[in-house]
Amino acid sequence: MSYFSFLGVFLVIPIAILLWLTRRDRQRGRQRPAQLASSPAWLALLLHVVIAFIYTTPWDNYLVATGVWWYDANLVTGLTLGWVPIEEYTFFVLQPILTGLWLLFWMRRWPGRQPAGEWQNGRLRAILVVVVAAGWLIALAILVIGWRPGTYLGLQLTWALPPIILQLAVAADVLWRYRRLVVTGIVPPTLYLAAADSLAIGSGTWIIDPQQSLNLLIGGVLPLEEFLFFLVTNVLLVFGMTLILARETKSRIAARRILAWEIGD
């Protein structure tokens, strides 16, 4: 299976379906609830596409340059930017669109009811930041000591966890408040893309270096690190879009700006 064939079948087609569903929802007047409409959906989606492209490009080029993964030259067009084929850059754009449209689809179906009581929880934010930061330090230690089988995992977590830490520090309690929506946004796209990745690896479209990975295969095909890649990238996307669109995040940032202004006055 060529790389562009993979993109067409597993990303372009479901994106087209989600766009059609988005258009149908608009025609029927189905919208996001007010709590999740603090910013335009298209702006949040575009922002994440741009950030994903910029943030992933140097990291993925390093992976290919150091042989963590590579691709079958006969299954790509041959157009490359740096070390990475143009198809991979296309994936950088399509995955955020796919996951973002999926999340927005369920946002439009979210009932908008909130549990009563106080939802702000600084302790939750602090605990989660400490836990994830500890994971980042462990991943960094793997790279520092040069444990070769942990290379892919270490590079993956040291790259992905810092922005997740930032998201949790800002509003982990907001994400917890919308936890059902967040889980719905993360789990199905992760499982779907992992299954598609298994087919691509099985057909030889790209290869993961067994010497630089843990060699723990899900279903005998998919390296654990590949599953984790889709998990952490979808976490980044869903966390980010939820926080941008949630009214609570906007209110918190505004309150902190007012406090900073009052302190500085």
Residue ranges, per PLM feature:
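Aromatic-rich, lipid-facing transmembrane alpha helices and their immediate juxtamembrane interface loops
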Residues: 1-265
